[in-house]
Curated annotation (Swiss-Prot):
Enzyme class: isomerase
E.C. no: 5.1.99.6
Keywords: Cytoplasm, Isomerase, Metal-binding, Mitochondrion, NAD, NADP, Nucleotide-binding, Potassium
Gene Ontology molecular function: metal ion binding; NAD(P)HX epimerase activity; nucleotide binding
GO biological process, one term: nicotinamide nucleotide metabolic process
GO cellular component entries: cytoplasm; mitochondrion
Protein name from the UniProt record: NAD(P)H-hydrate epimerase
Binding site for K(+): 70, 138, 176
Primary localisation category: cytoplasm
Pfam families noted in UniProt: YjeF_N
Length: 246
């Protein structure tokens, strides 16, 4: 088994800043597209449709998107999942008004006929049933979460904790509610079946349950020199894969 290499929340934010700074010039949109694409690949790898009955294939991937960029990764992931033959539904209770870009991501989901539920429309709890939902993508908070959690997300996470033993949760970058550096800090807490760390795992990933949580790294967008500059080795992705199982 490979040794986990981790970067703190502070360093993760610095890496992002530099990637999107004037020297390198990635846009947030570019990185988010690759991040969301890799999460969609992880869902496919973990829950393949091949060989499944029509009933199983019709089940939903329920994507819960938070107000920041972690939520944006979820919106992108849902679009790719639709292209991959899945049946995603997005719950987006607190929409980012930060940029036009988030509205565009929602327009794209409309274009792909992926339902996007608001807090006050539709009964989102209906999707927390194993006969209806294949897995839940937790794209609520990533590396910028600062406890304690505010509503409506506190209540949403409590509901997720109730069903996580019967519907697997795929957490994007950081399991929502965990301290990025320290891991689970309150009870109940999300224990994902799958964690997709983006760029490089954060320290909290050492708290995932051994033999119960599958850990992938995704967000394949940095060259070796850049990784080394921040003190870690790049991951050995194979071929055109956007994810690597750790
Ligand atoms: N290089 C990469 O790996 C990339 C990662 N990406 C993803 O971006 C997130 C980090 O995004 P950011 O916008 O900085 O933060 P979050 O989404 O984690 O959350 C900010 C959001 O949440 C609100 N908030 C914070 N704490 C609370 C709280 N206690 N209660 C309620 N609300 C809270 C805050 O106000 C903001 O609105 C990273 O993890 C990756 O998933 C990008 O896609 C780019 C590439
Ligand atoms: K998350």
């Amino acid at each position: 088994m490979s040794t986990l290499k981790v970067v703190s929340s502070k360093l993760a934010a610095e890496i992002d800043k530099e990637l999107m700074g004037p020297q390198i010039g990635f846009t947030l949109q570019q990185l988010m597209e690759l991040a969301g694409f890799s999460v969609a690949q992880a869902v496919c790898r973990q829950f393949p449709l091949r060989g499944k009955t029509e009933t199983e294939k019709g089940k939903h991937v329920f994507v819960i998107a938070g107000p920041g960029n972690n939520g944006g990764d979820g919106l992108v992931c849902a679009r790719h999942l639709k292209l991959f033959g899945y049946n995603p539904v997005v719950f987006y209770p607190k929409r980012s008004e930060r940029t036009e870009f988030y509205k565009q991501l929602v327009h794209q989901l409309n274009f792909f006929k992926v339902p996007v539920l608001s807090q006050d429309e539709g009964n989102w709890l209906e999707y927390l049933k194993p006969e209806k939902t294949l897995c839940i993508v937790d794209a609520i908070f990533g590396f910028s979460f600062k406890p304690p959690m505010r509503e409506p997300f506190k209540g949403i996470v409590e509901e997720l904790c109730k069903v996580q033993n019967i519907i697997p949760i795929v957490s994007v970058d950081v399991p929502t509610g965990w301290d990025v550096d320290k891991g689970p800090i309150s009870q109940p807490s999300i224990n994902p079946a799958v964690l997709v760390s983006l760029t490089v795992p954060k320290p909290c990933s050492s708290h995932i349950r051994e033999n119960q949580t599958t850990h992938y790294v995704g967000g394949r967008f940095i060259p070796r020199d850049f990784a080394n500059k921040f003190g870690f080795e790049p991951f050995g992705y194979e071929s055109t894969d956007q994810i690597l199982k750790l």
